[in-house]
A protein has these predicted regions:
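Cap/insert and terminal regions of metallo-dependent hydrolase folds
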Residues: 138-226
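Catalytic core of the metallo-beta-lactamase
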Residues: 92-146
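Active-site environment of divalent metal-dependent phosphoester hydrolases
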Residues: 11, 55-60, 80-81, 108-110, ...
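Glycine/small-residue-rich loop that forms an oxyanion/phosphate-binding "nest" at active or ligand-binding sites
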Residues: 53-111
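Active-site flanking residues adjacent to catalytic metal/cofactor-binding acidic residues
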Residues: 27, 53, 128, 147-149, ...
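Catalytic phosphate/metal-binding cores of nucleic-acid and nucleotide-processing enzymes, i.e., regions
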Residues: 49, 231-237
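Active-site metal-binding motif and surrounding structural segment of the metallo-beta-lactamase
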Residues: 23, 32-76, 143
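Conserved beta-strand hairpin/beta-sheet module of binuclear metal-dependent hydrolase folds
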Residues: 1-42, 111-129, 143-144
Length: 238
């Protein structure tokens, strides 16, 4: 399986997850549709579907365009609003060879979902734009994490106009570390850190601190154009 970052950060977020069979699932679509098509090497036929965490444009910008192309888009926050669900309701969706469990995480009053994705015998946890995660997936034995680390507490300026939104709607380093620790196991192979604030993160420090939590895993930072081959621990690398 291959994970590719097309965009990450406050200007837009979009990733692709491609299975061994060649099916691609788009994770958030917060960039112009032409950028998504380019990131797919213009091969739209390979796209099984798209999942969107929440309504903010840096995550959802192109979802109408994707729907107009006949591609299935899973927007659980809309479905949950439609049924007036409380914060404990989860939804499950099957898209091609991907099974996606959506669960709710707090984002400063905006309905927002994290995803646990099952594909190729692996479990991938995707969390972004959250204050904290109210769930543990320890028993699931997650293989891969794509998780936000938006700021470090001692690097943030409390006079920022969006300070309250940042602390109530985004993940601080200690919170990210706590989520990794809670869900860590010998099965965890990669922790990819995303949606990192330019002025509020020290990448080297964050990688080093998360590595202490999961020494067996590869810890890396998401950047546009970067990709990772995701394998289970017992999978042959050749």
């Amino acid at each position: 399986m291959k994970l590719t970052c097309l965009a990450t950060g406050s200007s837009g977020n979009c990733y692709t997850l491609t299975s061994a069979a060649g099916e691609t699932l788009i994770l958030d679509c917060g960039v112009p549709i032409k950028d998504i098509k380019k990131g797919l090497d213009w091969n739209i036929k390979c796209v099984a579907g798209c999942i969107v965490t929440h309504e903010h444009k840096d995550h959802s910008l192109s979802f109408y365009s994707i729907r107009r192309m006949g591609i299935k888009v899973f927007t659980p926050y809309e479905d949950l609003d439609r049924i007036e669900a409380d914060e404990n309701v989860m939804l499950t969706e099957k898209i091609g060879g991907f099974t996606i469990k959506a669960f709710q995480v707090p984002h400063n009053g905006t309905r927002n979902c994290g995803f646990l994705i099952y594909a190729d015998g692996q479990k991938i946890l995707y969390l972004t734009d959250l204050e904290y995660c109210p769930y543990s997936f320890k028993n699931t034995k997650v293989n891969q994490m794509l998780i936000e680390c938006n700021y470090i507490k001692d690097m943030i300026n409390t006079d920022l106009p969006n300070y309250i939104h940042k602390v109530r709607g985004h993940c601080e380093l200690e919170t990210t570390k706590g989520i990794v620790a809670t869900n860590n196991s010998e099965s965890l192979q990669n922790v990819i850190l995303c949606h990192m604030g330019v002025e509020t993160c020290d990448n080297d420090r964050i990688i080093a601190e998360v590595q202490k939590i999961a020494p067996q895993a590869n810890i890396d930072v998401a950047e546009a154009g970067k990709s990772w081959i995701l394998r289970k621990g017992d999978e042959c690398p050749f």
